[in-house]
């Protein structure tokens, strides 16, 4: 039987969370490292990691239908272009 690889994911922003989910879907449990105290990366306004470029009125520039993950839909009641706080809640 093949040995399960040891994997780490750097960052728990959108890309890091998607990578983590893909690994978990393949029965690989990664170690996830995030410099901030919570997930969200660039979508976390006032992120305590000091690296987020989010600003108070930030919205995504693509529709929620294009942004959503295939097996994790965005609520239909949410607007087409999400505010950063909604993106963070979605994550």
Regions found by a protein language model. Give the residues of each.
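Short, solvent-exposed coil/turn segments
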Residues: 2-3, 62
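N-terminal Rossmann-like FAD-binding beta1-loop-alpha1 element of flavoenzymes
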Residues: 3-32
């Amino acid at each position: 039987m093949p040995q399960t690889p040891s994997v780490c994911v750097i960052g728990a922003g959108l890309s890091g969370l998607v990578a983590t989910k893909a690994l978990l879907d393949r029965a690989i449990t990664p170690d996830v490292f995030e410099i901030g105290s919570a997930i969200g990366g660039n979508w976390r306004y006032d992120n305590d990691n000091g690296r987020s470029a989010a600003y108070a009125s930030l919205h995504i520039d693509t529709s929620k239908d294009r942004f959503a993950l295939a097996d994790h839909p965005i609520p239909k009641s949410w607007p087409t272009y999400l505010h950063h706080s909604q993106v963070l809640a979605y994550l």
